[in-house]
Amino acid sequence: MTIQMSYSLAAALVSALLAPLALQAGTPQSIEVVSFGAPRERLLQLGACPGCDLRGQSLQGEHLIGVDLRDADLRGVDLREANLEGADLSGARLDRADLRGARLSNADLTDTDLRRADLRDAVVINAYAPNVRTDGMRFAGADLTGSHLIYGGGPD
């Protein structure tokens, strides 16, 4: 038996074993798209909901570490005691949001609207916050260490 013949025999054997596993050409394949429904559900399932409208929702005590909420509408959202460490909140609207006791360390707050938000007792260490809007923000007892958060709100 020659080497050429042995190679051909081995190739034929491998081909015969794998043939049942091959897809037939032209067989349509479908991909099922699963919707996560409401924006709140999408945020909790995927950890991202950029541009979502979450106005008035309750996310109290949720673990939202590193979530993507860029340009989200979070006006009036209850985020008391929520963990938003490392979250991307750039461009988000958080006016009148309740962030009492929330953890926002290392969050991106670029261009975020925090007007009239309640950040009392929140931890906002080393958050990146250029162009943040803070008129009327409440921050008594908040730890703003290293955040360069230029606030305009009063102490209560």
Tell me what each language-model feature is.
Residues T2-A12:
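Bacterial N-terminal signal peptides that target proteins for export
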Residues G26-D156:
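Tandem repeat scaffolds
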Residues A10-P20:
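Bacterial N-terminal signal peptides
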